[in-house]
Design a protein with these regions (language model features):
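Structural preference for beta-strand elements that scaffold enzyme active sites
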Residues: 74, 110-112, 154
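Acetyl-CoA-dependent GNAT
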Residues: 7-10, 14-85, 96-98, 102, ...
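Conserved glycine-rich acetyl-CoA-binding loop
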Residues: 70, 79, 83-97, 106, ...
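Conserved catalytic-core motifs of GNAT/GCN5-like acyltransferases
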Residues: 112-115, 127, 132-147
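A short, glycine- and basic residue-enriched loop/turn
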Residues: 74, 123, 134-140, 152
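Terminal substrate-recognition subdomain of acyl/acetyltransferases
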Residues: 145-159
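Conserved GNAT acetyl-CoA-binding A-motif
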Residues: 103-114
Length: 159
């Protein structure tokens, strides 16, 4: 099931953001705890953070950002991560199915996301879940840990 994140989810989300297997593919570089708390509180206040859980255990997270005006039929999906302890258990597929259903229930027509072109596992998962590639943003993200720019692939799913 997916639900809005609460203050009680801070530690889980922080663990995901700082985990070496997930951080390279998330928006924020490693920051100190105080800065991360500011980021979390800002996202929390805007009610953008969601938790995916099964059997009462948090397994993953995502941000869902509804767009406005002429694009109010679209949501941007970001910060998608499954905790590495649960890699390979099918939770990524399950979470994406639930995200798609959530977006349908919100009356949305389109979900957009971007991910690093080097994140091949995520791209396969998104494609398996109905997302299609729409283009590549060259030198889009600076990966500080590797001192290089990386390309991002834009993807979408029409509902």
């Amino acid at each position: 099931m997916t639900r809005k994140a609460t203050q009680a989810d801070f530690h889980f989300i922080k663990t995901l953001y700082f985990h070496p297997k997930t951080n390279p593919f998330l928006l924020y570089e490693m920051v100190d705890s105080e800065r991360f708390e500011d980021i979390f509180n800002d996202l929390q206040a805007k009610k953008l953070l969601h938790i995916f859980e099964t059997e009462g255990v948090a397994r993953g997270m995502f941000k869902l950002i509804p767009l406005e005006f002429r694009t109010s039929h679209i949501a941007y999906l970001g910060g998608v991560a499954i905790h590495p302890d649960y890699f390979g258990a099918g939770f990524g597929s399950q979470m994406l199915l639930e995200i798609i259903e959530l977006c349908r229930s919100m009356g949305l027509r389109r979900i957009e996301l971007s991910t690093a072109t080097i994140n091949e596992k995520a791209i396969r998962l998104y494609e398996k879940s109905g997302f299609q590639k729409e283009g590549v943003l060259r030198d889009y993200c600076w990966l500080k840990s590797e001192s290089r720019f990386i390309d991002e692939v834009m993807m979408s799913c029409l509902l």
